[in-house]
Curated annotation (Swiss-Prot):
MF GO annotations: 18S rRNA (adenine(1779)-N(6)/adenine(1780)-N(6))-dimethyltransferase activity; RNA binding
Gene it is expressed from: Dimt1
GO BP terms: positive regulation of rRNA processing; ribosomal small subunit biogenesis; rRNA methylation
Annotated binding of S-adenosyl-L-methionine, by residue: 37, 39, 64, 85, 113, 128
Top EC group: transferase
Subcellular location: Nucleus, Nucleoplasm; Nucleus, Nucleolus
Family, similarity comment: Belongs to the class I-like SAM-binding methyltransferase superfamily. rRNA adenine N(6)-methyltransferase family.
Domain of life: Eukaryota
Keywords in alphabetical order: Methyltransferase, Nucleus, RNA-binding, rRNA processing, S-adenosyl-L-methionine, Transferase
Name of this chain's protein: Dimethyladenosine transferase
Catalytic activity: adenosine(1779)/adenosine(1780) in 18S rRNA + 4 S-adenosyl-L-methionine = N(6)-dimethyladenosine(1779)/N(6)-dimethyladenosine(1780) in 18S rRNA + 4 S-adenosyl-L-homocysteine + 4 H(+)
């Protein structure tokens, strides 16, 4: 009986909290289908803002402001907040929340899909992202110019752990190495699902991303083309990964284009398979596996291919 009473009490508290959040949001029902999970715990909101180390002169990009729980606190710290929100109902709530206050003049709201929007200039980014746009948003952010100082981002826990994974880790993947090529990434804290309204089905984590400025002198499309091939089967040796007929056809096409531009004659008995194996052997990566290779390894491998006229984009 005590357990039943406890469960009933917990459900009652959840309903009461939901009613309070609905009241704060003007009676809005949140659309979880587009990732609307409002961060309700003020301690976590404050911690995220502290981690951003904002300056009074900063312009802050906030993605997914929701009902403005974090927006208001950002406005108190920064010179300006540019909030990107997809839902017009929440845009109205944001404006209503600061209407008639000194903070109103510091808020700019961009209405629409952040992935399809041109990002403004900003010094720092703070975002409680819809989790389904995590990967494309990270790379939109990292390829944005001019450089920003840092981003404090909320992600699904597993995605966050992939971002910070190192060679040899189970979760180490293409996302890990591509992100770490362009930025320093740190896991800051775990956030339980009950800190959101409505609660998501997964646990969350907060990550800090600082872009490398200047960026590494590497063509990212070339880099990603190589990494994509090797991580399709990250446990295979590179020798095996490059035996794929689709991969060889792509690289031979690129090689022939390169030779045509350079006015280089290709021997009649040319074999792309032999060429690839020769490069893998000479660079010492033939028996290596992507799961255990770090950024320096991939840079050496990419330079080895490019030096022989083989390109990945």
């Amino acid at each position: 009986m005590p357990k039943a009473k406890s469960a009933a009490s917990s459900r009652r508290r959840d309903r009461q909290e939901q009613r309070r959040e609905l009241k704060r949001a003007g009676g809005l029902m949140f659309n979880t289908g587009i990732g609307q999970h409002i961060l309700k715990n003020p301690l976590i909101v404050n911690s995220i803002i502290d981690k951003a180390a904002l300056r009074p002169t900063d312009v802050v990009l906030e993605v997914g402001p929701g009902t403005g729980n974090m927006t208001v606190k950002l406005l108190e710290k920064a010179k300006k907040v540019v909030a990107c929100e997809l839902d017009p109902r929440l845009v109205a709530e944001l404006h209503k929340r600061v209407q008639g206050t000194p903070l109103a003049s510091k808020l700019q709201v961009l209405v629409g899909d952040v992935l399809k929007s041109d990002l403004p200039f900003f010094d720092a980014c703070v975002a409680n992202l819809p989790y389904q746009i995590s990967s494309p948003f990270v790379f939109k952010l990292l390829l944005h110019r001019p450089f920003f100082r840092c981003a404090i981002l909320m992600f699904q826990r597993e995605f966050a752990l992939r971002l910070v994974a190192k060679p040899g880790d189970k979760l180490y993947c293409r996302l890990s190495i591509n992100t770490q090529l362009l930025a320093r990434v740190d896991h800051l804290m775990k956030v339980g699902k009950n800190n959101f309204r409505p609660p998501p089905k997964v646990e969350s984590s907060v990550v800090r991303i600082e872009p490398k400025n200047p960026p590494p002198p590497i063509n990212f499309q070339e880099w990603d083309g190589l990494v994509r091939i090797t991580f399709v089967r990250k446990n295979k040796t590179l020798s095996a990964a490059f035996k794929s007929s689709a991969v060889q056809q792509l690289l031979e096409k690129n090689y022939r284009i390169h030779c045509s531009v350079q006015n280089t004659v290709i021997p009649e008995d040319f074999s792309i398979a032999d060429k690839i194996q020769q490069i893998l052997t000479s660079t010492g990566f033939s028996d290596k596996r992507a799961r255990s290779m770090d950024i320096d390894d991939f840079i050496r491998l990419l330079h080895g291919f490019n030096a022989e006229g083989i390109h990945f984009s």
